[in-house]
């Protein structure tokens, strides 16, 4: 799981992104999402990381109700962008979040996973626009929010870890723990 296989560079999708430095095989583990482990209460206190971008955080919600804050003691995994047609998946295993390849990834290709953000609110056009997706995939949903049917099935333990965003921070601690 060497981070030398990936590197952070400028992304055409959003700011910084993570790119394959060498070819990566389907199933390979690329990196662990690291950062300080904090409570939702602390995440709420720290929010927003950048007032100019209130919907952008480096939070990753864990099944335990804790949050990984990738801004503090984080690594390059925090720069992996969202795509509606991802080549990777983030998975929680024993309280750790690992990113692994869903398919072969070519050298120079940007690494993506589907954030699948779960919001405890009705998905209005305005809300979808707040979490607009710019991945450019052929079947782009237009938003980083999980499809409503995916939200209902989001309770799979140990699978499909979700990157926590400002919407989670805007909700109450109890609601945010539903991730």
Model-identified regions with their sequence ranges:
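C-terminal SET catalytic tail plus cysteine-rich post-SET Zn-binding segment of SAM-dependent SET-domain
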Residues: 83-179
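Catalytic cores of histone-lysine modification enzymes
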Residues: 1-91
